[in-house]
């Protein structure tokens, strides 16, 4: 819960930066770090694939100009999203199609696979929405002192 609150705060900070402000790199790094460090994330399962084939594949959706897999930083956020959507993500026997991905599976399987496929993610929604690529998330988290984009970034990471 504490990490989720910090993540929301980081996203809010990022959204307040004026266009052209170079601090976006730092803000992005902290969002990516908080997201990466969550013990588990939650996805909404595609109802059609679940009912017809029994597959638990995260739903791919659009939000304004962004398209990606919908991911939530807490179960409560995923639950509220499903509730607002009515029957779109609820089965006939009233099962809410919310899946959980634990940290290990997220790091070792989910992110690398979707980064390779060049997919995006939509984190949370509405005012807390943050959209980016799995590829960039993975690159930031694999970064170390040998992987510096420029001197300014190097100063931020120290």
Model-assigned labels for residue ranges:
Residues 1-158:
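An interfacial alpha-helical scaffold signature
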């Amino acid at each position: 819960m504490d990490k989720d609150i910090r993540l929301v705060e980081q996203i809010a900070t990022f959204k307040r930066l004026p266009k052209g402000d170079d601090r976006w790199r730092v803000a992005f790094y902290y969002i990516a770090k908080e997201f990466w460090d969550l013990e588990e994330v939650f996805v909404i399962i595609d109802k059609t694939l679940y009912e017809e084939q029994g597959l638990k594949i995260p739903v791919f959706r659009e939000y304004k100009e962004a398209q990606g897999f919908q991911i939530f930083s807490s179960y409560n956020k995923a639950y509220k999203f499903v509730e607002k959507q009515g029957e779109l993500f609820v089965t006939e026997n009233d099962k809410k199609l919310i899946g959980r991905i634990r940290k290990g599976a997220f790091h070792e399987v989910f992110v690398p696979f979707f980064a390779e496929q060049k997919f995006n993610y939509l984190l949370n929604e509405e005012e807390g929405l943050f959209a980016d690529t799995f590829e960039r998330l993975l690159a930031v988290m694999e970064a170390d002192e040998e992987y510096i984009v420029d001197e300014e970034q190097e100063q931020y990471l120290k």
